[in-house]
């Protein structure tokens, strides 16, 4: 992770140092080294490379920030529960009470005195028995 953060900065620093070396007032090069280096970048190429490096750095930084925001959004949903569940027994009790409440409010269970079909079946069974 640290490599991704430092590599664009390192490349940017190298490019700046190369450009600064070419702009020195008293160059270290001798007269024999006056021949142009085929691997040296022209000014236009250097600027394009610098712009591309800065663009890649900004894009990567934005991607990392978006990933961190998504992680914090996902954890913020459970943050209130995490604050409430500082004690394990409180957390377990809250979870069980929530599940118990959901169980009692679920109307799809087909048994008990509250079930409409059962009352009719019991009443018709009593009438048949007489």
Curated annotation (Swiss-Prot):
Residues 62-84 are annotated as: Disordered. Disulfide bonds join 85-91. The keyword Cytoplasm does not apply. Residues 1-25 form the signal peptide. Belongs to the calcitonin family. PANTHER family: CALCITONIN, CALCITONIN-RELATED. This is Calcitonin. It comes from Canis lupus familiaris (Dog). The gene is CALCA.
């Amino acid at each position: 992770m640290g490599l991704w953060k430092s590599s664009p900065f390192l490349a940017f620093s190298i490019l700046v140092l190369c450009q600064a070396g070419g702009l020195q007032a008293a160059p270290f090069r001798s007269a024999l080294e006056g021949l142009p280096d085929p691997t040296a970048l022209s000014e236009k190429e250097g600027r394009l490379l610098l712009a591309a490096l800065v663009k890649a750095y900004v894009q990567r930084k934005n991607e990392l920030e978006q990933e961190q925001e998504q992680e914090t959004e996902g954890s913020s949903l459970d943050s209130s529960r995490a604050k409430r569940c500082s004690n394990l027994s409180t957390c377990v009790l809250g979870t069980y009470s929530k599940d118990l409440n959901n169980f009692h409010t679920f109307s799809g269970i087909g048994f008990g005195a509250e079930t409409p079909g059962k009352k009719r079946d019991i009443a018709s069974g009593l009438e048949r028995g007489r």
